[in-house]
Amino acid sequence: MDLEKNYPTPRTSRTGHGGVNQLGGVFVNGRPLPDVVRQRIVELAHQGVRPCDISRQLRVSHGCVSKILGRYYETGSIKPGVIGGSKPKVATPKVVEKIAEYKRQNPTMFAWEIRDRLLAERVCDNDTVPSVSSINRIIRTKVQQPPNQPVPASSHSIVSTGSVTQVSSVSTDSAGSSYSISGILGITSPSADTNKRKRDEGIQESPVPNGHSLPGRDFLRKQMRGDLFTQQQLEVLDRVFERQHYSDIFTTTEPIKPEQTTEYSAMASLAGGLDDMKANLASPTPADIGSSVPGPQSYPIVTGRDLASTTLPGYPPHVPPAGQGSYSAPTLTGMVPGSEFSGSPYSHPQYSSYNDSWRFPNPGLLGSPYYYSAAARGAAPPAAATAYDRH
């Protein structure tokens, strides 16, 4: 079927620049498809023709056919959309007045709350209600600032003046704080403008020979001259910075000059107090400690040799097994009451049939000074006894 005879293509002489698409159809840039072609696309679609076949028969691009059919299925219309236009205006004077009224009643009202209230009071319907972003734009442009009213030029100056005042106050506070040099020396710092002017003058008066802007000690001294520090304070600061770092103030060897007594007065008093405390701790007297507190007590040192002859309160004495050297009867009688223990050597019936080598497989245990007295041990190595005495 030849559609060119029934549906002539539009001319391009009066409507603008045109062209021929890949299918051989003629189109005009910026103009919609003619209504007769649109109607034919819908008719072929109702007949069950596929969009790709419609595109080839009518020589219209596949995207154009799909767009026309999609709009027809959604809205039932084959009319073209507005080209270069926008959505219908929702910010009508009535809506703007209502939004302004809501903001005057409640300045903290959110945009979504305004939108819900417009729908609740039937000022707008679902199609004409402005979006949240549109309401925010209306509030910024038309509610907070009335139309035809210029922005006051003094607002910028007010903001800048406030910021300058705040910065200057912060600078003044930091200069007068206790962590600065002025705060340590107890000097009242002048205004920030005076300090800035003096710094600028110092930079101009003291050029650096190598061309860099890093100041040296001479520049700092020249900068600090004037009302900031006196000559005596400058000398004190120079001595402090020339002093060797990490030096011990109690063992310094340099002689202290008369003008340096103020620097070391606090340090000397602290050192003197520490010396007195050391002396008091080294030689305590009953008068200093107090009569109610007992003095230091000394306890005898019990070595490994005499450990066998000592007992702890509440525990029975240590009695070595039979055949390994035992205590005499008077010794046991003096250590514990006779009614509790007998004078015969201690033996257990369970181990009566075993010899000593089975009960003590390690011969080193038999030579330990812990189990024997001085008489039963015999000639023991002096190094072992000495090592045990230390522990």
UniProtKB/Swiss-Prot annotation:
Phenotype when changing G183S: In ALL3; confers susceptibility to ALL3; reduced transcription factor activity
Site note Breakpoint for translocation to form PAX5-ZNF521, residues: T303, G304
One of the record's GO cellular component terms: chromatin
CDD domains in alphabetical order: PAX
Region (RED subdomain): 94-142
BP-aspect Gene Ontology terms: adult behavior; B cell differentiation; cerebral cortex development; embryonic cranial skeleton morphogenesis; lateral ventricle development; negative regulation of transcription by RNA polymerase II; nervous system development; regulation of transcription by RNA polymerase II
SMART domains: PAX
Principal subcellular localisation of the protein: nucleus
Domain of life (superkingdom): Eukaryota
Region (PAI subdomain) location: 19-75
GO terms assigned for molecular function: DNA-binding transcription activator activity, RNA polymerase II-specific; DNA-binding transcription factor activity, RNA polymerase II-specific; RNA polymerase II cis-regulatory region sequence-specific DNA binding
Modification comment: O-glycosylated.
Keywords, sorted A to Z: Chromosomal rearrangement, Developmental protein, Differentiation, Disease variant, DNA-binding, Glycoprotein, Neurogenesis, Nucleus, Paired box, Proto-oncogene, Spermatogenesis, Transcription, Transcription regulation
Keyword DNA-binding belongs to the record: yes
Cellular localization per UniProt: Nucleus
Residue ranges for the DNA-binding region feature of this UniProt entry: 16-142
Region described as Disordered: 1-21, 182-218
Breakpoint for translocation to form PAX5-ETV6, annotated site positions: I158, V159
Breakpoint for translocation to form PAX5-FOXP1 (site feature) positions: Q260, T261
InterPro entries: Homeodomain-like_sf (IPR009057), PAIRED_DNA-bd_dom (IPR043182), Paired_dom (IPR001523), Pax2_C (IPR022130), PAX_fam (IPR043565), WH-like_DNA-bd_sf (IPR036388)
Oligomer and partners: Interacts with ETS1; this interaction alters PAX5 DNA-binding properties. Binds DNA as a monomer. Interacts with TBP; this interaction allows PAX5 to interact with the basal transcription machinery. Interacts with RB1. Interacts with TLE4. Interacts with DAXX. (Microbial infection) Interacts (via N-terminus) with Epstein-Barr virus protein BZLF1 (via C-terminus); this interaction inhibits BZLF1-mediated lytic viral reactivation. Interacts also with EBNA1; this interaction promotes EBNA1-dependent transcription.
Disease: A chromosomal aberration involving PAX5 is a cause of acute lymphoblastic leukemia. Translocation t(9;18)(p13;q11.2) with ZNF521. Translocation t(9;3)(p13;p14.1) with FOXP1. Translocation t(9;12)(p13;p13) with ETV6. Leukemia, acute lymphoblastic, 3: A subtype of acute leukemia, a cancer of the white blood cells. Acute lymphoblastic anemia is a malignant disease of bone marrow and the most common malignancy diagnosed in children. The malignant cells are lymphoid precursor cells (lymphoblasts) that are arrested in an early stage of development. The lymphoblasts replace the normal marrow elements, resulting in a marked decrease in the production of normal blood cells. Consequently, anemia, thrombocytopenia, and neutropenia occur to varying degrees.
Its job: Transcription factor that plays an essential role in commitment of lymphoid progenitors to the B-lymphocyte lineage. Fulfills a dual role by repressing B-lineage inappropriate genes and simultaneously activating B-lineage-specific genes. In turn, regulates cell adhesion and migration, induces V(H)-to-D(H)J(H) recombination, facilitates pre-B-cell receptor signaling and promotes development to the mature B-cell stage. Repression of the cohesin-release factor WAPL causes global changes of the chromosomal architecture in pro-B cells to facilitate the generation of a diverse antibody repertoire. (Microbial infection) Plays an essential role in the maintenance of Epstein-Barr virus genome copy number within the host cell by promoting EBNA1/oriP-dependent binding and transcription. Also participates in the inhibition of lytic EBV reactivation by modulating viral BZLF1 activity.
UniProt name for this protein: Paired box protein Pax-5
The species this protein was found in: Homo sapiens
Gene that produces this protein: PAX5
